[in-house]
UniProtKB/Swiss-Prot annotation:
One of its GO terms (cellular component) is cytoplasm. One of its GO terms (biological process) is D-xylose metabolic process. This is Xylose isomerase. It is found in: Cytoplasm. InterPro entries: Xyl_isomerase-like_sf (IPR036237), Xylose_isom_bac (IPR013452), Xylose_isomerase (IPR001998). The active site is at H100, D103. GO terms for molecular function: magnesium ion binding; xylose isomerase activity. Mg(2+) 1 binds at E231, E267, D295, D338. Its cofactor is Mg(2+). It is an enzyme of class 5 (isomerase). Keywords: Carbohydrate metabolism, Cytoplasm, Isomerase, Magnesium, Metal-binding, Xylose metabolism. Gene3D superfamilies: Divalent-metal-dependent TIM barrel enzymes. It comes from Burkholderia thailandensis (strain ATCC 700388 / DSM 13276 / CCUG 48851 / CIP 106301 / E264). Binds 2 magnesium ions per subunit.
Length: 440
């Protein structure tokens, strides 16, 4: 019997439905700005929180009792987990999924066993993909859970740990390519430090850059045409991570000439941990030319750690989608639910409730963001604010037509007297609220 056999396929039933196992707002075929909601959102379910996490926290052991998490032959349990995962994807009706290598295959006792186990499970995932039509949004390697990576992977003081990590990424990237994945993600969970007293910052940055360059080289060697993405996070599990936020990642990539090879996968909860809004990180990624994909979740404002809850704020996501839509939407990226049910949510239905609610929130937010894009009121006020830079004088400054000295002389000769214009923040906020809360 399938773990989810008693749960029906999730269908769109409209806003008036009181069926908890139905979409009220996500009509995947509805067209918005020339695309269907499914094409815009490109929703993915993550393997790790949904099928791997046993429900433990720092104060208690696992509270979940999934069948594939019980003792048994490791590869058989991995296949059982894959069966449940694809049953879930198809019942939910989501087009994509994501995984770490060790989510889908047992690691084994050594590197040879890792390679063999992973290869077998990649074959099995490929069969499920072909049968279901579910696609891989991105793959990645877990370079943070095992004690060998306690001091980092690429930034480890032990080159053997670096080599082990390189082996995992080599095979995970190969697997992503083989499974038709559209991106490959690098998250440096332990690429950072716990104390500066034993850390050589310059050396560790050089090691990290070398590792990234090797990944880029391998991508081109195997002909992988998807995007390479770094996922920024400021801390946790380390005190400070080298991929702190979007700007920090861009600075690292630029320093080592990798800015045209790697983009970013932005997680909402990581943005808030870095002291930024989700909106800020997405807007900054577009401004720096490195936007790639999104991990959709939320944190708890009263907690200082990564709670990975399902997103539930239409307001927050409307602004995020506004930035994405006004820049043309996703290309290879999508909305991956890097979110988990709470430790007390032990029923199979809880997995569906979490995803259904979050998917409806995404649909609502995208439609409201589309209103902001279509009416152009925000962009019109933004263009008006900078209009003077489009004058002959403004363009001459930006084109290098003045030196500092000649511009100072010109300002003195003209007796410039700049006048401050309103930033109109209150009006702009009202425009956003009108789009979000307008009766339909």
């Amino acid at each position: 019997m399938s773990y989810f056999e008693h749960i029906p396929a999730i269908r769109y039933e409209g806003p008036q439905s009181d069926n908890p196992l139905a979409y009220r707002h996500y009509d995947r075929t509805k067209r918005v700005l020339g695309k269907t909601l499914e094409e815009h959102l490109r929703i993915a379910v993550c393997y790790w929180h949904t099928f791997v996490w046993p429900g433990q926290d720092v104060f208690g052991q696992g509270a979940l009792r999934r069948p594939w998490q019980q003792p048994g032959e490791p590869l058989e349990r991995a296949r059982q987990k894959a069966d449940a995962a694809f049953a879930f994807f198809t019942k939910l009706g989501t087009p994509f999924y994501t995984f770490h290598d060790t989510d889908v295959a047992p690691e084994g006792a050594n590197l040879h066993e890792y390679v063999e186990n992973f290869a077998r499970m990649v074959d099995y995932l490929g069969e499920h993909q072909q049968a279901s039509g579910v696609r891989l949004l991105w793959g990645t390697a877990n370079l943070f859970s095992h004690p060998r990576f306690a001091a980092g992977a690429a930034t480890s003081p032990n080159p053997d740990a670096f080599a082990w990590a390189a082996t995992q990424v080599c095979h995970a990237l190969d697997a992503t390519h083989r499974l038709g994945g559209e991106n490959y993600v690098l998250w440096g969970g332990r690429e950072g430090y716990e104390t500066l007293l034993n850390t050589d910052l310059a050396r560790e940055r050089e090691q990290l850059a070398r590792f990234l360059a090797m990944v880029v080289e391998h991508k081109h060697r195997i002909g992988f045409t998807g995007a390479l993405l770094i996922e920024p996070k400021p801390q946790e599990p380390t005190k400070h991570q080298y991929d702190y936020d979007v700007a920090t990642v861009h600075g690292l990539l630029t320093q080592y000439g990798l800015q045209n090879e790697i983009r970013v996968n932005i997680e909402a909860n990581h943005a808030t941990l870095a002291g930024h809004s989700f909106h800020h990180e997405i807007a900054n990624a577009f401004a720096l030319g490195v936007f790639g994909s999104v991990d959709a979740n939320r944190g708890d404002p009263q907690n200082g750690w990564d709670t990975d809850q399902f997103p539930n704020s239409v307001e927050e996501l409307t602004l995020a989608f506004y930035e994405i839509l006004r820049h043309g939407g996703f290309t290879t990226g999508g909305m991956n639910f890097d979110a988990k049910v709470r430790r007390q949510s032990v029923d199979p239905e809880d997995l569906f409730h979490g995803h259904i609610g979050a998917i409806d929130v995404l649909a609502l937010a995208l439609e409201r963001a589309a209103v902001l894009v279509e009416n152009d009121r925000l962009d019109a006020l933004r263009r008006r604010r900078y209009a003077q830079w489009d004058s002959e004088f403004g363009r001459k400054i930006l084109a290098g037509g003045y030196s500092l000295q000649s511009l100072a002389a010109d300002a003195l000769a003209r007796g410039v007297n700049p006048q401050h214009a309103s930033g109109a923040q209150e009006r702009l906020e009202n425009i956003v609220n009108q789009a979000i809360y307008a009766l339909r």
